[in-house]
Amino acid sequence: MAQHDFAPAWLNFPTPPSSTKSSLNFEKHSENFSWTENRYDVNRRRHNSSDGFDSGIGRPNGGNFGRKEKNGWRTHGRNGTENINHRGGYHGGSSRSRSSIFHSGKSQGLHENNIPDNETGRKDDKRERKQFEAEDFPSLNPEYEREPNQNKSLAAGVWEYPPNPKSRTQRMLVIKKGNTKDLQLSGFPVVGNLQSQPVKNGTGPSVYKGLVPKPAAPPTKPTQWKSQTKENKVGTSFPHESTYGVGNFNAFKSTAKNFSPSTTSVKECNRSNSSSPVDKLNQQPRLTKLTRMRTDKKSEFLKALKRDRVEEEHEDESHVGSEKDDDSFNLHNSNSTHQERDINRNFDENEIPQENGNASVISQQIIRSSAFPQTDVLSSSLEAEHRLLKEMGWQEDSENDETCAPLTEDEMREFQVISEQLQKNGLRKNGILKNGLICDFKFGPWKNSTFKPTIENDDTETSSSDTSDDDDV
């Protein structure tokens, strides 16, 4: 018995005592109590107190030997012969019978007059032992539920509200999150007196109570199982529940216990409440599926653009702009956290997805790196090149003529020689050489403005290529 002095309160397993146990207790505590009439008187007083006293009052002078506070969580819920049972814990799970066979010879005479008590209390002991096991540990004794349950403890916990077996699998999905709010929203009963659940704010007790297996209950039992503490809980449950945000739901459960249709509606309420976090879990794969489809469309679109280098893009900028808006929106959906700027640097060079991600991305200036001196090839349409260069920030009027000197005849002659050599080598495609110099001088008004940025591009980048990654290509 001494090992229970250092155990926490929830490990105190109440046990059916015997007069042998009482004598053994006296032997273990012989340093506190002498082997004189004191022991005999205390024994008589303990056994006689079971006649008419309540369990909390029946041992006024140390019938419990200082263990009343250890068993205090159990001393106020029963009456009658229960005070016999407040004598300690299981020894290896086996209970001793209440006969005087186990007594040694020296204590035999002292307990002979207790034998009538032992004979009459034996049936009560078995019944109360089952009651102890099934009320506090019903998962250990599922067949107890067939017996009538009349003495209920006032402590409120998960056993007054056993989990609903129909919505159990959904609840286990929610338990994995380990969130107290989700547990309460999914229908777990976390109501009750603060004395019975002292650590209610932490996730530990509620997760533990959600994971404790529920005994296989017959379907008619829960009303009888819950109806005993209805009167006790109506007064105390509302303030505790309202602080945890489940006031309406558990108030409905506590007031609607005695009616079978209301219990079915409670189950429906359980199911609806527990399905809401599960729906949140199910929305994630749905969203990723949609973005996957969008990115597949986008990749196909980009592959098509790479394949034929469509000239309609340069001639029909509005159509391309609308497609690029859709493109960048899909890019934002799939990479909202990474802000990948270029999936294909040839086509969406300067598009950065917006961080807020509300609706579609507004149309931005679409800049193509193919106008720079790379291996990318422009179309042969001069109008498209002109429009593209204007988009890049090059101006058609004579502002650029002030900053660059006009070309001399020697420079033009040298350029033509270089372009002829390159053309002989077969590097000319669609009117553009790979070094980015334009060899056709039919368009006189803007040849200077075209020539200067392509030359300057080697050391100083132009105004519109600040965010481009052409040097890395």
From Swiss-Prot:
Taxonomic path: Eukaryota, Metazoa, Chordata, Craniata, Vertebrata
Q: What is its main location?
A: nucleus
Biased amino acid composition, Low complexity: 93-107
- Keyword RNA-binding attributed: no
**Protein name per the record:** Vasculin
Q: Where is the composition biased (Acidic residues)?
A: 456-473
Enumerate the subcellular locations listed in this protein's record, separating them with semicolons: Nucleus
Role summary: Functions as a GC-rich promoter-specific transactivating transcription factor.
Listed under subunit, the entry gives: Interacts with GTF2B, GTF2F2, RNA polymerase II and TBP.
Any Pfam family hit:
Vasculin
Which family, according to UniProt?
Belongs to the vasculin family.
Q: Which InterPro entries match?
A: Vasculin_fam (IPR028128)
